[in-house]
């Protein structure tokens, strides 16, 4: 019964993500842990805004084997890696939003640091806007096992929290339930949009923009 509720919650999250436009043209992939040895993940080539329960495939997390023989998402290995690394993770959401894709290319370092935003508290455990939230950025790679190795190497030195970006590709985020994963996704997307807008304003800060209306409060309307 719990599994059915979680899958129902994941389907609802996928439809919501589709409405947001965060997984266009069948992009992205979503998964749900069943137990320590198995997860469900979206089948390759499925539109995330119209997924049904039968579009999720059973996968063995130890080796990415799919008993049904159907084709799971090409990035299944990143989902199963996260489930192996962190037993508390129950759901993983991978999206291709404009904000995540562009910001991951604009940021030249290997991490995006978010600080000063009240909405950082949408992420579990965050208590203050003064703290720094570090979202690692990994260079994109069509060799998913190689990319997974780089993610695992990072995690050996510093625990992954909330999510990571793949440059020019998108966001992976997760939670200890579908509800938490969805909240983390929404919070991070808001923060990404804020950070992207802030950087755009910084670039244009030397431009003298004058209002095209009279804003003098002492002038009476005629």
Swiss-Prot record:
Q: Name one Pfam family in it.
A: Aldolase_II
Keywords in alphabetical order: Amino-acid biosynthesis, Lyase, Metal-binding, Methionine biosynthesis, Zinc
Question: Which residues are in coiled coils?
Answer: none
Query: EC number(s) in its UniProt entry?
Result: 4.2.1.109
List required co-factors: Zn(2+)
Q: Which GO terms describe its biological process?
A: L-methionine salvage from methylthioadenosine; monosaccharide metabolic process
The top EC class is lyase
Q: Which reaction is catalysed here? A: 5-(methylsulfanyl)-D-ribulose 1-phosphate = 5-methylsulfanyl-2,3-dioxopentyl phosphate + H2O
| UniProt binding sites for Zn(2+) | 94, 96
**Single GO molecular-function term?**
methylthioribulose 1-phosphate dehydratase activity
Gene Ontology, cellular component aspect: cytoplasm
Q: Which InterPro entries match?
A: Aldolase_II/adducin_N (IPR001303), Aldolase_II/adducin_N_sf (IPR036409), MethylthioRu-1-P_deHdtase_MtnB (IPR017714)
The entry sums up its family as follows:
Belongs to the aldolase class II family. MtnB subfamily.
**What role is this protein assigned?**
Catalyzes the dehydration of methylthioribulose-1-phosphate (MTRu-1-P) into 2,3-diketo-5-methylthiopentyl-1-phosphate (DK-MTP-1-P).
UniProt protein name: Methylthioribulose-1-phosphate dehydratase
